[in-house]
Amino acid sequence: MHARLCSLAAAVALAAGAAPSLAQLRVGEWNVTNYGGAGARDAAFRTALYASFNGRQFAPDVLVGQEFLSQAGVTAFLANLNSAAGSPGDWAAGPFNNGADTDNAFFFRTSRVQFLGMTIVSVGSGSPNHPRDINRYDFRPVGYSGAAATIAAYSSHMKAGNTADDQARRLLEAQIIRANAASLPSGWNFLLAADLNIPSSAQSAYVELVGPQANNAGRFFDPILTPGSWNNSNAFRFVHTQDPAVTMDDRFDQILLSASLLDGLAFDYIGSLSIPYSTTTWNDPNHSYRAWGNDGSSFNNLLTVANNQMVGPTIAQALIDAANGLGHLPVFLDLRVPAQVASPTLIDFGTVSQNATAQATLTVTNAGNTTLWTVAGIANLRYTLAASAGFTAPGGTFTEAPGGGSNAHTISMSTASIGPKSGTITINSDSPDEPVRVVMVVGNVVAAACYANCDGSTTIPILNVNDFSCFLNLFASGDPRANCDGSTEIPVLNINDFGCFLNAYSVGCP
């Protein structure tokens, strides 16, 4: 992983503490505890999802869920997402498959996310297999089509318990998920949003997910750099997610990311990759990752309601009520969407005299959709320029922020030889939809004009008595073209211009 500090705009947003997802792409994870359909908990879910406290709200763009009991449960939860006060009402659900136990679900905002499809990665069953199905949901942000703008989101609800059999079944599930991630199409990003039921980062299943191996293509990373023995440890009280209705003492619910979402290029986690999550405050300005509702004051108790500093009493109580007596807090993180490159497709130098300077300007723009994502929600464009033979472009790596500006680059064309010229300027960038953008460059180089050939004739001999007559006529009429020596003295035309013309005539034309 490459260490990278947040941009100033993102840092300001983070300092506000889990602000609504008005710009970035917010991904949420929530085990909804045996949800089978419309019922007494629905009002609590709606409040937890869209109520606001001090400008903060959950308001995800993508929600990965576990412990759905049926298609009716998915349909009812979708209705909660669309009917909650403050909801944009643009939610849809991915396909539901009814496995052997409780099941996964995937919800997304259609104005911001393109859903590509669902894959049943592995079917759950009894021991020694993992107990529940593993699902993968593939999507992209609206306005993108490239592989590097695609995310495969895995949903998993691993085996609970700490017997040898429990741990072996979790390890098997981790192995299956990592192997599937390693087989994804080239350039894809991936994440795991799951109820891991893992009490410590030292357990084999977690090591399998995040540890280095000979093949690291399917490796996951904890974006908040918080390994440890999470269970019943006060040191991790700000990241505990279970159980808001009983005792907050486990970090079972997590979102893990691929290296490609943590490299500072294109699709990217909004947060610092060099600083672990705070152990002294829930409102960590270095991370967008949050355990929604956990202000760190609930260790070994049910979730704090009165004076809850993160979400206030109304949302805190809703999170408890949604847990159904034994449940989980949602977690979320924010992603910055990739840049999009734009430039002219053609640069025409026109007609240029031989050996004259020929320059033109190439403008490169970050065309990310700021109306949809805002400036803070789009990554900077990073690119280099490469010119074909006969043309030159500036070297080095360039950066262009979103928001309507552009970088201007001087492109030069060689004029050493006569004739039509053509070539390309290649923009190599981290724009996922067009990583290689080719700009055509054309021009025409002609012989320099010969001053002594006053009448512009092309017959042989080019210079003859007609050129003397032409020059005399220009001089007599006061035409500025007779100012052969380029003088500015008064009179501008004088005997020196005759001498200048005779010298040019004696030199001849090439």
Predicted regions and their residues:
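Bacterial N-terminal signal peptides that target proteins for export
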Residues: M1-A9
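Cleavable N-terminal signal peptides
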Residues: A9-A11, S21
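Feature for long, exposed domains in two main contexts
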Residues: V337-A448
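Acidic glycine-/aspartate-rich tracts in secreted/extracellular proteins
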Residues: T33, L69-S70, N82-S83, R112-V113, ...
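Divalent cation-coordinating acidic motifs and surrounding scaffolds
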Residues: A23-A339, V439-V441, V446
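Cellulosome-associated attachment modules in secreted, modular CAZymes
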Residues: N444-P510
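Hydrophobic alpha-helical membrane-insertion segments
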Residues: A40, D166, S204, V337, ...
